[in-house]
Amino acid sequence: MSGGREIALLGGSFNPPHVAHLMAAWWALATQGVSEVWLLPTFRHPFGKDLAPFEDRLEMCRLAARALRGVHVCGAEAELAADPLVGKTARTLEHLAAKHPDHRFALIVGADILAETAKWYRWDRVQALARVIVVGRQGHPPVPGAPDLPAISSTEIRARLARGEDVRGLVPEKVLRYVEEKGLYRG
């Protein structure tokens, strides 16, 4: 895993992707010495949450990624759909390391995730396969050298959409248009 370009992975449900995701990607590109950021939507949520169809979330990530040079989308978890460990970050990292032996990987996580790593499958393996980059989250202890991202959540965005409320400014414009055209997250 030495040498090569370092790719930062920003994983999540992206249900839907929002501007704080793009802020995290931009910050990693600008300050963490990574060549690219790959948005990595989970195929199936590891803790069983209901999600919009994978293809819709993948397309919303593609639309969001267009806003920033150096941000791309990785659908690797779909390649692992039949794997019983799909959605487990350690398994996804193993798959990507085998598929892209010329790359090094970093994993962008929010400060809120650090308190939950005991619940993760093989967090030790995740740390062995990727440099962990932590971004701050409002309402959590500060991370030295990292900005606190705004407290924007996909859960709140879905709730607002279900109530028919405006979410402009919280999600990229092209993502919002896609959500409206597809009728996603309506109550």
Swiss-Prot record:
GO terms for biological process: NAD biosynthetic process. One of its GO terms (molecular function) is nicotinate-nucleotide adenylyltransferase activity. Its EC number is 2.7.7.18. It comes from the Bacteria. Belongs to the NadD family. The lineage of its organism: Bacteria, Pseudomonadati, Myxococcota, Myxococcia, Myxococcales. This is Probable nicotinate-nucleotide adenylyltransferase. Keywords: ATP-binding, NAD, Nucleotide-binding, Nucleotidyltransferase, Pyridine nucleotide biosynthesis, Transferase. The keyword Transport does not apply. Pathway: Cofactor biosynthesis; NAD(+) biosynthesis; deamido-NAD(+) from nicotinate D-ribonucleotide: step 1/1. It catalyses: nicotinate beta-D-ribonucleotide + ATP + H(+) = deamido-NAD(+) + diphosphate. Catalyzes the reversible adenylation of nicotinate mononucleotide (NaMN) to nicotinic acid adenine dinucleotide (NaAD). Pfam families: CTP_transf_like (PF01467). It comes from Anaeromyxobacter sp. (strain K). InterPro entries: Cyt_trans-like, NadD/NMNAT, Rossmann-like_a/b/a_fold.
